[in-house]
């Protein structure tokens, strides 16, 4: 098994990232067989596709690395690195841009969402973004790519690109990766203010998300203010249909406590959200507070974070190099 995944170093790590991706990365790392390999990276080249504040980006890279380590990524067992430090990502991305088709990228919903009404003003990088993401995983012959549901379409594109390249050049160079989306309730954590929007770093309202950096009081306040409805908790999952905010809070509680929607409803049905919310707050504080404390400690040692990232990049480069060499050979660029 070769597990590869990334996160953009923009803004704070939030509960959606944790449940949809990071805590699953940690579990895969912790349950790994000795021959499995895990590569996790800060997708800083992806962060260039929208407006860049260089000082902010520099700070965010360290902060996100510290947040991943605080969440349980162990640099001795996983390869943790900065995408831009391994040049092969950008190099392979170019090659794969010549394999991917305009029509495939035109179907990517994230570009439509992120460019909004201003398609003409969006960067070319924002459009080509999913091809760089394909390069990120194909470079390492990833077998499993653990991501939240919102990234599924991008991983499916990576599969299409791998298949077309292999087919066009009569090679088996690229392993076709599997998107590895969490089962249960964590694959798509929604905003606390709007059950139809996903929890996201880019939501202007901080009340919409729980951050790794939130104090216990901030978590309690956000849950207190989270949108719900006046109905009591149902006894069956079907009773959550048409109640996206209620469903989201039950889903979060299930994911955080290791339960299922059914088990949460079995314990809490008939209650109003006024009494469910304190239980949810306690569960979230129990999850977040220890990670936040570790993050604060790690922040104090920027040099150590830099050392970890540099060592990770050295290891990643060794794994990346043969893919580029072989890609250039089958393309006719080298003998
Ligand atoms: P990013 O930085 O937006 O998010 C990092 C991870 O968190 C997951 N996630 C969520 N999961 C559940 N509910 C949510 N509300 C939620 N919000 C975010 C994302 O699905 C993701 O797994 N393009 C990627 C980064 C990337 C990448 C890659 C991922 C670059 N190259 C190669 C995998 C493989 C992104 O912007 O994720």
Protein language model annotation of sequence segments:
Residues 116-165, 169, 191:
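Internal, conserved structured core segments that host functional sites
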Residues 102-106, 139-146, 254-264, 292:
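Short helix-capping/linker segments at secondary-structure and domain boundaries
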Residues 65, 72, 100-103, 142, ...:
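A generic secondary-structure signal for well-formed alpha-helical elements
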Residues 15, 153, 159-335:
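Conserved nucleotide- and phosphate/pyrophosphate-binding catalytic cores
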Residues 60, 88, 153-154, 245:
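An acidic site on a long C-lobe helix of protein kinase domains
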Residues 10, 142, 205-207:
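Short, solvent-exposed beta-strand edge segments and adjacent coil->beta transition regions
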Residues 2-135, 283, 296:
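N-terminal Rossmann-like or analogous alpha/beta NTP/dinucleotide-binding catalytic cores
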């Amino acid at each position: 098994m070769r597990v590869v995944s990334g996160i953009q170093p923009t803004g704070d790590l939030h509960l959606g990232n944790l449940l949809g991706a990071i805590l699953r990365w940690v579990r895969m790392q912790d349950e790994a067989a000795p021959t499995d390999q895990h590569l996790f990276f800060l997708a800083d080249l992806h962060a260039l596709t929208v407006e860049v504040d260089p000082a902010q980006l520099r700070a965010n890279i360290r902060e996100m690395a510290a947040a991943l380590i605080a969440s349980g990524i162990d640099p001795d067992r996983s390869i943790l690195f900065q995408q831009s430090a391994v040049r092969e990502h950008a190099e392979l991305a170019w090659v794969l841009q010549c394999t991917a088709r305009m029509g495939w990228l035109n179907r990517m919903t994230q570009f439509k969402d992120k460019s909004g009404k201003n398609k003409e003003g969006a960067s070319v990088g924002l459009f080509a973004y999913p091809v760089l993401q394909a390069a990120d995983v194909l470079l390492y012959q990833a077998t499993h790519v653990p991501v939240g549901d919102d990234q599924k379409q991008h991983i499916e594109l990576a599969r299409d690109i791998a298949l077309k390249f292999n087919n066009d050049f009569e090679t088996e160079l690229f392993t076709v990766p599997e998107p590895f989306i969490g089962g249960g309730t964590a694959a798509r954590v929604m905003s606390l203010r709007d059950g139809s929007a996903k929890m996201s770093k880019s939501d202007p309202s901080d009340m919409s998300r729980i951050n790794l950096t939130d104090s216990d009081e901030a978590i309690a306040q956000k849950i207190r203010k989270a949108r719900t409805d006046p109905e009591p908790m149902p006894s069956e999952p079907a009773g959550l249909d048409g109640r996206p905010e209620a469903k989201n809070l039950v889903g979060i509680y299930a994911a955080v406590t290791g339960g299922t929607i059914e088990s949460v409803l079995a314990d809490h049905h008939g209650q109003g959200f006024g009494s469910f919310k304190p239980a949810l707050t306690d569960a979230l504080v129990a999850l977040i507070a220890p990670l936040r404390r570790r993050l604060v400690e790690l922040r104090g040692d920027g040099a150590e974070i830099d050392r970890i990232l540099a060592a990770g990049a050295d290891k990643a480069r060794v794994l990346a190099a043969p893919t580029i060499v072989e890609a250039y050979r089958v393309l006719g660029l080298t003998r």
